[in-house]
Amino acid sequence: MTVKPLRDVTPKPLEGEERLEQSLRPATFDDYVGQVKIVDNVKVYAAAARQRGESLDHVLLSGPPGLGKTSLAHILARELGVTLHVTSGPALVKKGDLAGLLTALAPRDILFIDEIHRLSPAVEEALYPAMEDYRFDVVLGAGLGAQTMEMKLERFTLVGATTRTGLLASPLRDRFPIQERLEYYGPAELKEIAVRAARKLGLPVDEDGAEELARRARGTPRIAIRLLQRARDFAQVEGDGRLTREVVDRTLRRLEVDARGLDAMDRRILAAVIDTFGGGPVGIDAVAAAVGEESGTLEDVYEPFLVREGYLARTPRGRVALPAAYAHLGRDRPGGKQGSLV
């Protein structure tokens, strides 16, 4: 039987994962692992707003997917003692979709919009007066006889999450007084996250097993938890129920996640740049066509890790394979130097 591995290390949430993520999600700032500076800052902002009895200023959270932006929004709502209303940019198709959400907000509630960079222009424009003046303008009629009716809104907090800050229009981005960027996690932080999650799942875990899983989780908590789930399955069926280094190695080998945390799609991307396009530079659309994936998915999901780990470079002329990519795939670099298969 062939295991299909391509989706196991994507930091995007997979279908059916939301329920598990909610059960493992940190409940308070003290439970939240990593992003120390951001958590410390946001904790102060939330405490000050609560003491003054005011709504928190609007917050923009950016960074690669799977790093805990949604978890921070949930914690903020809990710390402020308000209700969190969750939606996403693609879900807000018409102004009416936004109006329904905004008019349902109680004082100081939080509206969380994931993938806020994907808002339609019409919805984005309607959001501006809501953020600044806490009003929503409704146009009645059409043409010369059209009239604008102003609907007053309760003072609320908008928390926007984005993986691509550059796609946000400047007028929208500038309306967020609080802007924080989440960064990839270190192995020690991911190990702590894995150990805590294993404890909640009732899974005994060895120190070296947790360390190995964390080392190969691409700096992303969501991936660490996903790999932990799969390792739990192998520990239960093919082991003694304990998460050991051997179980983690076996699990990731079956999922085709290599020793550096690269999966099959990562290797296909690097191979395409090197073998098909001579190492680059090559445009992202050409790479996407070569590997059979959408260019936006490559930019959001795969490239950040490959760039951060030194396998790929983004240049004004396109993507370029770096020496580490040649070495990892065992390819000869231009100039004749032999790579070594890692």
UniProtKB/Swiss-Prot annotation:
Region (Head domain (RuvB-H)): 259-342
Reactions performed catalytically: ATP + H2O = ADP + phosphate + H(+)
Residues annotated to bind Mg(2+): 70
Residues reported in the UniProt entry to bind ATP: 24-25, 66, 69-71, 132-134, 175, 185, 222
Chain segments carrying region Small ATPAse domain (RuvB-S): 186-256
Compartments it resides in: Cytoplasm
GO biological process per UniProt: DNA recombination; DNA repair
Keyword Hydrolase attached: yes
Biological role: The RuvA-RuvB-RuvC complex processes Holliday junction (HJ) DNA during genetic recombination and DNA repair, while the RuvA-RuvB complex plays an important role in the rescue of blocked DNA replication forks via replication fork reversal (RFR). RuvA specifically binds to HJ cruciform DNA, conferring on it an open structure. The RuvB hexamer acts as an ATP-dependent pump, pulling dsDNA into and through the RuvAB complex. RuvB forms 2 homohexamers on either side of HJ DNA bound by 1 or 2 RuvA tetramers; 4 subunits per hexamer contact DNA at a time.
Domain-level remarks: Has 3 domains, the large (RuvB-L) and small ATPase (RuvB-S) domains and the C-terminal head (RuvB-H) domain. The head domain binds DNA, while the ATPase domains jointly bind ATP, ADP or are empty depending on the state of the subunit in the translocation cycle. During a single DNA translocation step the structure of each domain remains the same, but their relative positions change.
The protein's name: Holliday junction branch migration complex subunit RuvB
Gene: ruvB
